[in-house]
Amino acid sequence: MNRNQHKPMFVTFLINILLLQLLNLTNASPSPPITALYAFGDSTVDSGNNNYIPTLFQSNHPPYGKSFPSKLSTGRFSDGKLATDFIVSSLGLKPTLPAYLNPSVKPVDLLTGVSFASAGGGLDDRTAKSSLTITMDKQWSYFEEALGKMKSLVGDSETNRVIKNAVFVISAGTNDMIFNVYDHVLGSLISVSDYQDSLLTKVEVFVQRLYEAGARRITIAGLPPIGCLPVQVTLTSINTPRIFHHRICTEHQNDDSRVYNQKLQKLIFGLSQRFRGSKVLYLDIYSPLIDMIKHPRKYGLEETLRGCCGTGLLEAGPLCQPLSRTCDDVSKYLFFDSVHPSQTAYSVIASFALQKLFPLL
């Protein structure tokens, strides 16, 4: 038989396969509604847990919270809401994501999510220990404690359903790189690549813990452009005139962030293959932040490499105080202090995640 005679049959076969796949997609049941959001990590998702521990890494004082409802200084390292607050509100879960250690949080509140995160912490427990904040191991212990409270309230079956359909957010790594590589005396002795690999191993272990606890929707944030954080711009230009004028990002640190994020995405792909029935996804924060830096006018921003608090060069936490001068219009600033994004920036990050990531969950 002529080889060309097989072509129509083969094409028909392919079309039938494609039609079957489309039919399966059409008939596939939609993902169950998201029941809750639980956050682990550092200041990017800490709703105020550090208010209840003895550490200098606190922001429960003005001018923090100046854009928050009632201008409350809740312990969030921003002028207002974090990305996780915008997300839980958009999902219809609650107005904002509370801190687990907040005494006002009741067992029923745990059913729709809380933050276990701690500003100053990291994937490497040594980071949190050096800043006297809550390690990832301790955050995990708090999560197990919360599970017990939930089971006492609604039983094992309902708790398991909540956990299975909840979104888990891990956002950490920036402090690890800054404290242990860039701004540490031992940094020159550490291979950046090797240290990144050690952090990713910790991510893998934590995700496995979540999976074994019943989590099936897990998102892991990559690193931001660390070299564009105002404090890093300042510290790497301390001896040059550009400390005040013509400030530019520290590109080798941004390069490190991009490499880490590539490694993280590779790890996440492997975890997705390994943990069948789960959705482990990469939460890209680098792209929206660098886009705001490169195209500020698109977002109504005017200042992207200085914070709103004080000089905007070094102030954060205890250095950003009630008497600190603040900018006239924080909505035009990408960063509120020298490290942490403003509410405006967090709103953009949340919108980016809700558009690009959450439809996949």
Curated annotation (Swiss-Prot):
Pfam families for this protein = Lipase_GDSL
Its chief place of residence is: secreted
What EC number is given for this enzyme? 3.1.1.-
What Gene3D superfamilies does the record point to? SGNH hydrolase
Q: Which GO terms describe its biological process?
A: lipid catabolic process
The compartments listed are: Secreted
Keyword Secreted annotated: yes
Q: Name one GO cellular component term.
A: extracellular region
Active-site residues, as the UniProt record annotates them? S43 (nucleophile), D337, H340
GO terms for molecular function, please? hydrolase activity, acting on ester bonds
Q: Does the keyword Hydrolase apply?
A: yes
Q: Which cysteines are joined by disulfide bonds?
A: none
Keyword terms, alphabetized: Hydrolase, Lipid degradation, Lipid metabolism, Secreted, Signal
Which N-terminal stretch is annotated as signal sequence?
1-28
Similarity comment text for this entry: Belongs to the 'GDSL' lipolytic enzyme family.
- The protein's name is GDSL esterase/lipase At2g40250
